[in-house]
Every structure is written in structure tokens, then in C-alpha cells.
A protein has these predicted regions:
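Outer-membrane beta-barrel pore proteins
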Residues: 50-52, 58-71, 134-139, 153
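Short glycine-rich, polar/acidic loop-and-turn segments at beta strand-coil junctions
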Residues: 64, 72, 77-83, 88-90, ...
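Residue-level detector of alpha-helical secondary structure
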Residues: 42, 57-64, 74, 479
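Surface-exposed strand-loop-strand hairpins of Gram-negative outer-membrane beta-barrel proteins
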Residues: 45-54, 83-125
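Transmembrane beta-strand segments of Gram-negative outer membrane beta-barrel proteins
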Residues: 32-47, 66-85
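Generic, well-ordered alpha-helical segments
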Residues: 67, 74, 79-83, 122-126, ...
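Gram-negative bacterial Sec-dependent N-terminal signal peptides
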Residues: 1-27
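Outer-membrane beta-barrel porins/channels
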Residues: 27-44, 48, 98-100, 104-109, ...
Length: 484
């Protein structure tokens, strides 16, 4: 290949990845997001990034880059559609069916409470998720990789008005977008090591109604001295926080035979303290409970008297929350049966037990701390490629993913449970453009029914849910890979 032609093809490859990095990222379904291209989705992630010339190794297992024999740029766009429905009941702190007492613009309560009888509508979402990888061999021993990935992301959106879920969750969104650089070294012809760094931008958004009168009725500060009703008015709290953090990852790859490849990878836990702002969109009654100092309460607001040390500002204040990215360990195996059929299997352990609670702080004080007590999980996957013709490759796979949630602390923000993935995919080499391959995949998620026995913290009003969420999801993935 002459130098001019090489430079042109290199420019095309860089443009593919550069165009992706310059685009906006979007939220995908699930707290933990698979970081593969369409070929990986088609195999349900079986074999990880150990298949021949898979550029997703740049993030998933950088050691595998040492066995990639050409420059590769890859762009994937995923379309995710997640559906969630709640069915069940909600109760106030007394155990009565949940209600709300409307108030007018002057803070005057209505004549009667209104039942909260809505089930929150459709809690799911649709989204587009771009992912990109690039691998460049430096010589016969070293290779360098770049990627843009979304390792963490989840979203739920429930109705606010008349909803049984309004005191537990309205909108929730967590997204982490990372840019990575990695390097691999082939120690021997059958063994390689690799490692890399990730710089990630995390954003979090949560909102829910604050049941201030219910919280006052349960408060230690007032000691039950006043018989407050539950659910008076509307006080929608919105919290938006973000952070930039740095982490690292590493991996090893061993080829014990000319047909087998084994890989082990580790992605370290990343400390992630997010900071931002909160606002409370309160009616006249709620605003008064947060701002008006009452002589009979020691010249404190109702909120301050109910929970000493707690201050809420309806016009907003600074906020912070810590949501660390858990460590993972992945073990992958790929076996080449013949020149047409290749099979892969994987296991992924995630240290979700590091996520114990979600604590919101402001100006040195804890507004609320919600326990989650997640447990460590395993994901098992099996998938493969069948080269149907010299240009067409067919793929299929199945995976089982354990949930980190517990029945005792699961809530509508993340109503997760164990799930199965089933996937189909294809790859086609474009004859008119040598080096260009188009891949596609369809993946369906079957999620076990999630029970919700959530009890709110006292300072959130002490409401209780008794119901279940049924969820299902599907992902359509399309990618372009250019080798040069």
C-alpha cells in the first residue's frame, strides 16, 4: 500500500471515531450498560471482546488488542426501548390508602382529600446510544486503543399527578459517558497484557414529591405532638448533579491452543462524588413549611423543628451525592471449531455491594439517605458466529444477568430484577468498499417480575408501596467497522 493511500484510509478511520466522540451521548436502559458493538450484542456478549479483530477490546479487555492485525475504527448506534408498568397499592404513614389534599394559590386546603389512584403510567423510555472504538497496532508487539463508552446508565419516568408513586419516584436518570485510552503488549505469541485509563463524565437527575406533613407527623423533633394529615399539597423536588472522574482497567489474554483464547479483565471501582443543585417546586403551603419561622416552634420552620439540623430551600441550594462505579471482573473464552463456526462464553462479576445507599447532602447537612444495600452479581453469557458465506456472518446468543437489588429495598427508581437476554445478529462485508463491514443485532430482555415493598424514610413522609413492576426491553444495534 502506498503512503498516500494509507494516509487517506487512516483519515477515514479516524473520522468515523472522531465523529462519534463529537456527538452527544444518550441514556441506555439498565444501571449497568453493556459496552459492546453490534457484533457483541448479536452474541449476547458471549466471548467478550476475544473474537478475531474485535475493536471493543480497547475498553473491555485491552490485552486482546495485541492480537489485532490491522487498524480498525468502529461505530455502533443502539436503539433501546424499555417498558415498565406498576400495579399495586400505596399507603400513607397511618396505613390508610394514599391521598392528597389540594391547596389553592393562597395555601388554603381544599374540602376533601383526593385518592392517589394512578399507577404511574408508562415508566419506561426510548433512547439512542452511540459507542465507538479504535485500535491501532504500533508494531508486532504493541497496540494502542481509543473508545467512547457508556458503562453506566439507567432511567425511569413515572407520572406525578395522581400517582401512587409520586412520593417515591417521578424522574430518575443516571448516565456515565467515558473516553478511554489503552495500550497492549504481546509478551509471547500466545500471551498478552494490557491496561488503560478512563475519563468519565457522570450526570444524575432525580425528582419526587416531598410529603412534608407526613414527615412532620413522624418527626422525632415534634414527638407526635401535632396530628398532621398526610399528603397536603405538592412539593416536587428536583436534584441535578454531575462529576468528572478518572479510573483504570487492565486485562490479560492467553491462547493455550491455536483454536482457544482465554481472557481475564478487571475494571477498578471509581469514586464518584457528584455535585450540583436542587430546587423544590412547592405550593404556598409547602413553601411556608420550609420558610416561615413559627414562635410556638422555637422560632423555627416546621421542617427545622421536625428534623433538627435539616433545612430546605424552595428556591434551591447546592447539593451533592456519591454514586461510585463498582468494580468488575470478567472471564471470557472463545473456541474456533472450524473456519466457519466460532463459539464464546463469558462470566462477569460486578461488586454492586459497594452501593449501600443514596445520600443527598446540602450545605453540610444530610437531606435524606435512602438505603439500597445492593448485592454482588454474576452475568453468564453464551454466543457465537457462523460464517454463512464469504461475506455474510450470522450470530446468536443468550445471557442471564442477576439483579443487585433486594426485595426489602427495591423502589420505583430502579425496579430491577433478574433478566434473560436473547440475541440475533449478522455481519456483512461490503464488496464495493474493501475493509468496510456492516453489523446488526436485535436483543430482547425478559425481566422477572419485581416486587415493590418500599417504605419511605420518615423525613420523606413514611409512605409505603405494596405492588409489582413488570418490565421488558429490546435493543436494536447497527454498526460500521472499517479496517485499514
Amino acid at each position: 500500500m502506498n503512503n498516500k493511500k494509507y494516509k487517506l484510509q487512516a483519515a477515514i478511520g479516524l473520522a468515523v471515531l472522531g465523529g462519534l466522540i463529537g456527538s452527544g451521548s444518550v441514556q441506555a436502559g439498565g444501571f449497568s450498560t453493556p459496552t459492546y458493538g453490534a457484533p457483541g450484542w448479536g452474541r449476547a456478549f458471549g466471548g467478550g471482546s476475544l473474537f478475531k479483530n474485535d475493536p471493543s477490546a480497547a475498553f473491555n479487555n485491552p490485552a486482546a488488542m495485541a492480537f489485532i492485525d490491522r487498524n480498525i475504527a468502529h461505530l455502533t448506534v443502539d436503539y433501546a426501548r424499555i417498558k415498565m408498568k406498576y400495579k399495586g397499592n400505596a399507603y400513607d404513614f397511618r396505613g390508610d390508602p394514599a391521598t392528597t389534599l389540594p391547596v389553592d394559590g393562597d395555601g388554603n386546603p381544599g374540602d376533601a382529600s383526593v385518592p392517589l389512584d394512578g399507577n404511574g403510567g408508562q415508566g419506561g423510555f426510548t433512547a439512542w446510544l452511540p459507542t465507538g472504538f479504535m485500535v491501532m497496532p504500533i508494531n508486532d508487539r504493541f497496540a494502542f486503543g481509543l473508545s467512547q463508552v457508556v458503562p453506566m446508565g439507567m432511567r425511569s419516568t413515572w407520572d406525578q399527578n395522581g400517582s401512587k408513586l409520586r412520593d417515591f419516584a417521578v424522574d430518575t436518570k443516571i448516565e456515565t459517558v467515558g473516553l478511554t485510552g489503552s495500550l497492549s503488549y504481546k509478551v509471547r505469541d500466545d500471551f498478552a497484557v494490557g491496561g488503560g485509563l478512563i475519563v468519565q463524565r457522570s450526570q444524575g437527575f432525580v425528582s419526587q414529591n416531598l410529603n412534608l406533613t407526613g414527615a412532620a407527623a413522624l418527626s422525632p423533633g415534634l414527638g407526635g405532638a401535632i396530628d398532621f394529615p398526610s399528603g397536603v399539597g405538592s412539593n416536587l423536588m428536583r436534584v441535578k448533579v454531575d462529576n468528572t472522574s478518572v479510573g483504570w482497567f487492565t486485562g490479560v489474554v492467553w491462547k493455550p491452543t491455536d483454536r482457544d483464547t482465554l481472557g481475564l479483565n478487571y475494571h477498578a471501582k471509581i469514586k464518584n462524588k457528584m455535585e450540583g443543585h436542587y430546587n423544590i417546586y412547592a405550593d404556598a403551603t409547602g413553601r411556608g413549611q420550609m420558610t416561615v419561622k413559627l414562635p410556638n416552634l422555637g422560632n423555627k420552620t416546621l421542617v427545622e423543628a421536625a428534623y433538627p439540623g435539616l433545612k430546605l430551600f424552595p428556591d434551591g441550594a447546592k447539593a451533592s451525592a456519591e454514586l461510585d462505579i463498582p468494580a468488575t471482573v470478567g472471564l471470557d473464552w472463545v473456541h474456533v471449531f472450524d473456519d466457519r463456526f466460532t463459539m464464546g462464553a463469558s462470566m462477569l462479576w460486578t461488586q454492586w455491594s459497594s452501593f449501600k445507599d443514596l445520600t443527598l447532602k446540602s450545605q453540610g447537612n444530610t437531606i435524606v439517605s435512602i438505603p439500597y444495600k445492593y448485592k454482588d452479581t454474576m452475568m453468564y453469557s453464551l454466543g457465537g458466529d457462523y460464517r454463512f458465506t464469504d461475506r455474510l456472518t450470522l450470530r446468536a446468543g443468550v445471557a442471564f444477568d442477576e439483579t443487585p437489588t433486594r426485595d426489602s429495598t427495591r423502589d420505583p427508581r430502579i425496579p430491577d430484577n433478574d433478566r434473560w437476554f436473547t440475541s440475533l445478529g449478522f455481519g456483512y462485508d461490503i464488496k464495493a468498499i474493501p475493509g468496510l463491514t456492516i453489523d446488526g443485532a436485535y436483543s430482547r430482555q425478559f425481566v422477572k417480575e419485581a416486587k415493590l415493598k418500599t417504605v419511605n424514610q420518615d423525613r420523606l413522609g413514611g409512605s409505603r408501596l405494596d405492588g409489582k413492576v413488570n418490565a421488558k426491553g429490546e435493543v436494536v444495534s447497527l454498526s460500521a467497522t472499517y479496517s485499514f
